From Swiss-Prot:
Top-level taxon of the source organism: Archaea
Coarse class of the protein's main subcellular location: membrane
Alphabetic keyword roster: Cell membrane, Hydrolase, Membrane, Protease, Transmembrane, Transmembrane helix
Gene that specifies this protein: eppA
Protein name: Prepilin peptidase EppA
Taxonomic source organism: Methanocaldococcus jannaschii (strain ATCC 43067 / DSM 2661 / JAL-1 / JCM 10045 / NBRC 100440)
Length: 339
């Protein structure tokens, strides 16, 4: 086993230790990142020469950009790993392609996991309603193919998105779509009986399953946008650096207001705040979460009796475990010469 493979194993161990700490304490100790940087720069330079230095600094710049919407400690791990992936002819805009794969895979897994949690929590609503919408989609497409109606697909998909939004706001409509969704198998059987040629020619069963999966995915995204992030009430005294508030705290001369806003409402609020050039001070967290200064302000407001003793904090998931999984996948794909 050569030195580079030994270093890959050492990095895996360090990432694993960082992941365990991230799960337990939601922090990434600097000692792991610093150890990786020192080891990887030395070994990377030994194997790849100046390419390792280029890889390090170009990835650092990329990670500084990424850290605007993510935790800085998380993305620094990509920078630390860059020198040992600086293979010749593997650079894309001065960044090793293996690091880009690692970032993409890690972020993909990190995005899929909370979506899976939403599906597990709301599957009794999402799946029957998605079956109803797939059935409606199939029926409408049947007539579109017969009469060749132009631009109908755009209208149909707009209806699907609108229907999901409405079902989130109107409980009776949601129950209506859920009940009709149970007719989905009967719809497939009925279509097969009345027009077997069409059913086979357009492979209706397979396309229906694909459409069903697409609509379920759209539903999960809309559920997330309309406020099903998992959140917990947290006492002011228990707030920590990095916590992401679901609440927005608005401070002006007339008093303090705490608003519990979902993603869509937060975006709308920020746009209105910027357009109106509002001079009100706001405490609103991004991917970095609360800073120590934010926590001091919140505690001061609490001591003055201006805000409640508990705030809504979005439940987040440690990112480093996803990096570990991505790291293993990238190494396996490299060794198998797939990437």
């Amino acid at each position: 086993m050569d030195l580079l493979n030994v270093v890959y194993i050492i990095n895996f161990i360090l990432l694993l230790l960082a992941a365990i700490t991230d799960i337990k304490e939601r922090i990434i100790p600097h000692k792991y990142t610093i150890a990786m940087i020192i080891i990887n720069l030395v070994v990377g330079y030994y194997y790849f020469g100046f390419n390792a230095i280029i890889a390090f600094f170009s990835t650092l710049i990329l990670c500084l950009i990424l850290s605007i919407g993510m935790g800085g400690g998380d993305v620094k791990l990509f920078t630390a790993l860059a020198p040992i992936f600086a293979y010749p002819n593997s650079f894309v805009f001065y960044i090793p392609k293996y690091i880009l794969y690692l970032i993409a895979i890690s972020m993909f897994i990190a995005a899929v996991f909370p979506m899976y949690k939403i599906l597990m929590r709301y599957w009794k609503d999402i799946i029957p309603s998605a079956c109803y919408l797939t059935m409606m989609l199939g029926i409408l497409y049947y007539f579109i193919n017969i009469y060749e109606i132009p631009y109908a697909s755009i209208i149909i998909w707009a209806y699907i998105v609108l229907s999901i939004f409405v079902s989130r706001k109107v409980p009776k409509y949601k129950e209506y779509t859920k009940k009709l969704g149970y007719l989905f198998p009967a719809y497939l059987l009925f279509l097969y009986i009345i027009d077997t040629t069409y059913f086979i020619k357009y492979n209706v069963l397979l396309t229906s399953i694909i459409y069903l999966c697409e609509i379920i995915l759209i539903s999960i995204v809309i559920y997330a946008l309309t406020g099903v992030e998992t959140s917990d009430k947290k006492h002011i005294e228990e707030l920590k650096e990095g916590d992401i508030l679901r609440d927005v705290i608005i401070i002006d001369k007339d008093g303090v207001e705490v608003k519990n806003l979902n993603i869509m409402k937060r975006i709308k609020f920020l746009l209105e705040h910027e357009i109106k050039e509002n001079e009100k001070e706001i405490i609103l967290t991004d991917g970095e979460g609360l800073s120590n200064e934010d926590i001091r302000k919140i505690k001061k407001l609490y001591m003055e009796g201006k805000i409640p003793d508990k705030l809504n904090v979005i439940k987040t998931y440690p990112f480093v475990p996803f990096v570990v999984i991505g790291y293993v996948i990238v190494l396996m794909l490299m060794k198998l010469a797939i990437i």
